[in-house]
A protein has these predicted regions:
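N-terminal loops that bind phosphate or other acidic moieties
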Residues: 1-23, 27-251
Length: 251
C-alpha cells in the first residue's frame, strides 16, 4: 500500500519548468493534495498543520485553510484516461487494485476523498465536480490541476496521435501488434491503445501482461504473460512473443 504513503508534492518543481504536463501511471492516490500543500493550502488536524499530507493522513484532516494559496497555473495538461475521480467506475475503482488497494481500502478512500473535496470547496467556493471526465488520471491529479488550479485538460492520446500523424501511418499496415501491461475496459477510456484500435482496420493482436477485458473480440488473437509474468517477466514475455510469431508465420 505504498500508494497511501506518497503524494504529488514533488511535481511542483517539474511543473515550473514546462508548459505541457503529461499525466498517468502514477503510484499515489492523493488526487493532488500533496501539490496543493506545496502551493499554500493548509491541511489541518486538531489545530496542527500536516506539513506533507499523504493519503494515509486523510482521515485525520478536519479543516482546510487557503490563506496563502497560489493558484491559476498556466499549464497544458494531457490526460491518459477519461475516467472520473469519483462516481460510477471512479479512478479508484478502476486503477486502485493496480496500486495495491483492496476493495475495502478503495471504498474507505473514496469516502475520505469526497469528504476532503467538500472541505476544500467550502474554503475556496469553486463548485467542484469530481464526477467529470478526465478528472481521475494520475490518482486524481487531473481533478486538482483542472478544477482547483485552472489548468486546461485534454486527451493525451489525441494529442500524441495528432503530433505524430500516427493514424495516417496505420493505413500502411495490415497487421497491428498492440502492447499493454494489462488490457481491460479502462484501456478503451481515452488511452492511446484504445484510440488506435478505433482506427486500425487490419488484423489486431494483443501482446502483453494480461488480457482482462470482457469483450474477447477486440483482437484477432491475444498473447499474454499471465500471473507468471509477475514472477518472471522476461521469460514470460519471450514465450508469449514466440507464440505470436508462430501465428504470424502461418498467416
Amino acid at each position: 500500500k505504498d500508494s497511501m504513503l506518497i503524494n504529488s508534492g514533488c511535481l511542483l518543481e517539474a511543473m515550473q519548468k514546462t508548459e505541457t504536463l503529461g499525466t498517468g501511471g502514477s503510484k499515489t492516490v492523493d488526487f493532488g493534495i500533496g501539490l496543493l500543500s506545496k502551493l499554500g493550502i493548509e491541511f489541518i488536524s486538531n489545530g496542527e498543520i500536516i506539513l506533507d499530507p499523504v493519503p494515509e493522513n486523510f482521515p485525520f484532516i478536519d479543516s482546510v485553510k487557503a490563506t496563502n494559496f497560489k493558484s491559476n497555473l498556466e499549464l497544458r495538461v494531457l490526460s491518459d484516461t477519461k475516467t472520473p475521480l469519483l462516481g460510477k467506475d471512479s479512478a479508484f475503482d478502476v486503477f486502485g487494485p493496480q496500486k495495491g488497494l483492496s476493495k475495502e481500502d478503495i471504498e474507505k478512500h473514496k469516502l475520505e476523498v469526497e469528504r476532503l473535496i467538500t472541505l476544500i470547496d467550502k474554503e475556496l467556493v469553486l463548485n467542484l465536480n469530481p464526477n467529470e471526465i478526465y478528472s481521475g488520471a494520475a490518482g486524481g491529479l487531473t481533478f486538482t490541476l483542472n478544477q482547483i488550479l485552472g489548468c486546461e485538460i485534454e486527451s493525451g492520446a489525441k494529442y500524441f496521435i495528432k503530433e505524430t500523424n500516427l493514424i495516417k501511418q496505420l493505413e500502411n499496415y495490415d497487421i497491428g501488434i498492440f502492447c499493454e501491461g494489462k488490457f481491460d475496459e479502462s484501456s478503451l477510456e481515452g488511452k492511446i491503445i484504445g484510440e488506435l484500435l478505433k482506427e486500425f482496420k487490419g488484423h489486431r493482436y494483443f501482446l502483453g501482461g494480461q488480457y482482462a477485458a470482457k469483450n474477447e473480440n477486440i483482437f484477432t488473437d491475444y498473447f499474454q504473460c499471465g500471473p507468471e509474468g509477475i514472477k518472471n517477466p522476461k521469460s514470460s514475455l519471450e514465450i508469449a512473443t514466440n507464440e505470436l510469431i508462430k501465428v504470424l508465420k502461418k498467416d
